[in-house]
Design a protein with these regions (language model features):
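Basic, polyanion-binding surface patches
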Residues: 1-166
Length: 166
């Protein structure tokens, strides 16, 4: 018998994860949400994955045959954008400077970096769908900035470890 979902979440909160805003476009509809379940899959072809809960508006748009999406990797100073896309029912795109990438998906002009994707494949897994995206365009926007990280139920920064004996 598998462990309880509360135990599962308790363990995973100890794993630090980068914070992204995933935006999805289908037809004229767009939506976005904060996602930490993001990973690279393959360099050839360039593939990434995001995991999207079945219950949300984003999942509905991802399921359309014309869906495109972008993964916006947030900078350490972009907690407000992360929170807006995680919790707000207001116009999520009202904060931040947004533009349209090659596929038509919204990308954040001043993110750390972004990946613009078409849906390569879908895989149902429990309460979520794993979307594999084929990267059509990408950009490192602010290469000298630190990423936003989420660990142990809070946003964190990255601190370089310095060994004075080196």
């Amino acid at each position: 018998m598998p462990i309880q979902s509360e135990d599962f979440r308790d363990v995973l909160r100890h794993f630090p994860a980068g914070v992204t805003v995933v935006t999805v476009k289908s037809g004229e509809d767009t939506h976005g949400l904060t996602v930490s379940a993001f990973a690279s899959v393959s360099p050839k072809p360039p593939l990434i994955l995001v995991c999207i809960d079945h219950r949300g508006r984003a999942h509905e748009l991802f399921e359309h045959s014309d869906a495109v999406f972008a993964v916006n990797i947030l900078r350490a100073d972009q907690e407000d954008i992360s929170n807006r896309f995680a919790f707000s029912d207001e116009d999520r795109f009202a904060i931040g400077n947004w533009t349209t990438a090659k596929t038509g998906a919204p990308v954040l002009d001043d993110a750390l970096a972004w990946l613009d994707c078409t849906v390569y494949s879908r895989h149902t897994a429990g309460t979520h769908t794993i979307y594999i995206g084929e990267v059509q365009a990408s950009r490192v926007v602010t290469p000298d900035e630190a990423p936003l990280v989420y660990w142990n139920r809070a946003y964190r920064g990255i601190v370089d470890s310095v060994n004075e004996n080196d």
